[in-house]
Curated annotation (Swiss-Prot):
ATP binds at residues 132-187. Pathway: Cell wall biogenesis; peptidoglycan biosynthesis. Pfam families: Dala_Dala_lig_C, Dala_Dala_lig_N. Belongs to the D-alanine--D-alanine ligase family. Residues 104-300 form the ATP-grasp domain. This is D-alanine--D-alanine ligase. Keywords: ATP-binding, Cell shape, Cell wall biogenesis/degradation, Cytoplasm, Ligase, Magnesium, Manganese, Metal-binding, Nucleotide-binding, Peptidoglycan synthesis. The lineage of its organism: Bacteria, Pseudomonadati, Pseudomonadota, Gammaproteobacteria, Pasteurellales. Its cofactor is Mg(2+); Mn(2+).
Length: 303
């Protein structure tokens, strides 16, 4: 049986902090698959228990839930239990990569470059002076397990550190304080093990926050952004990072240059945005993959 003969569900929405983005991605993906003749139904998981997918006759899932159970391995495990193939990474890679702290530990273990960090756990005392002595200023403070820059603060003074940590702790029990990387910011899509052109992100404000990602029309995206040599360099790094954490199908890996122009790994997005602002389709388009074809390819890679 071909995939076009199967009943496919696009899962989107949900209840994570990234719900609104996922609704937009879900609408775009559902429309693309319908235009290609697939038997597809969009399902907002906020109002639909996942365990009822089998009763509904669903045979395959396109997962476009951002954050929460859609990216932390819970949905992936449930679908495997039901025997339903799904797009994107498996249980282990999904669980690990939503946790920025453990992702960075895995990269560091094999010698891949990533910004220096200090970990703060809920209930621990925060020694701001000691942290700044180690990392310098400015620093970025972020929850370990949130996406879309939710709860992220750029801290420029010692006095700002504690309030920033307290804000991040609203979203997670583990918070990362990371050394600032002064260079350019890139996001690098990977499709079926092939690294696509890096997209340089130039936000209007201090950094690429939620507003810059999904609301602002003033964020600039440059693609292709690198010379052939630099693209080859970042591709080698990103491919290694992708393989270390066990990604499959598709993912997007964020990278930043330090002051000397060296690439540093930031984080993995195992369920990349697919909205009008989204980076993955912008990059794919530059190598001749239109939006509908990209969506279809991701679906074909489901397992």
């Amino acid at each position: 049986m071909s995939i076009k003969d199967e009943k496919i569900a696009v899962l989107f929405g949900g209840v994570s902090q990234e719900r609104e983005v996922s609704l937009n991605s879900g609408a775009a993906v559902t429309e693309a698959l319908k235009s290609l003749g697939y038997n597809v139904e969009g399902i907002d998981t906020k109002d639909f228990p996942i365990e009822k997918l089998k009763e509904k006759g669903i045979q395959r899932v396109f997962n476009i839930l951002h954050g929460g159970i859609g990216e932390n391995g819970v949905l992936q495990g449930a679908l495997e239990q039901m025997g339903i193939p799904y797009t994107g990474c498996g249980v282990m890679a999904s669980a690990v990569t939503l946790d920025k702290f453990r992702t960075k530990l895995m990269w560091q273990a094999v010698g891949l470059p990533t910004a220096d960090m200090v970990v703060v756990r809920r209930g621990e005392a925060v020694d701001s002076e000691q942290i700044i002595a180690k990392l310098g200023l400015p620093v970025f403070v972020k929850p370990s397990s949130e996406g879309s820059s939710v709860g992220v603060t750029k801290v420029k003074t010692v006095e700002q550190l504690l309030p920033a940590v307290e804000e991040a702790l609203k979203f997670d029990s583990i918070v990362l304080v990371e050394a600032f990387l002064a260079g350019k910011e890139y996001s690098v899509p990977v499709l079926d093990g092939q690294v696509l052109p890096a997209v340089q992100i130039i936000p209007e404000g201090e950094f690429y926050d939620y507003h810059a990602k999904y609301i602002s029309d003033n964020t600039q995206y440059l693609v292709p952004a690198l010379s052939d040599d630099r693209q080859a360099e970042v591709a080698e790094l990103v491919k290694a990072a992708y393989e270390v954490v066990g990604c499959r199908g598709w993912s997007r890996i964020d990278v930043m240059e330090d002051a000397n122009g060296h690439f540093n790994l930031v984080e993995v997005n195992t369920c990349p945005g697919m909205t009008s602002h989204s980076i993955f389709p912008k990059s794919a388009a530059t190598v001749g993959i239109p939006f509908e074809k990209l969506v279809e390819r991701v679906l074909e890679l489901s397992a």
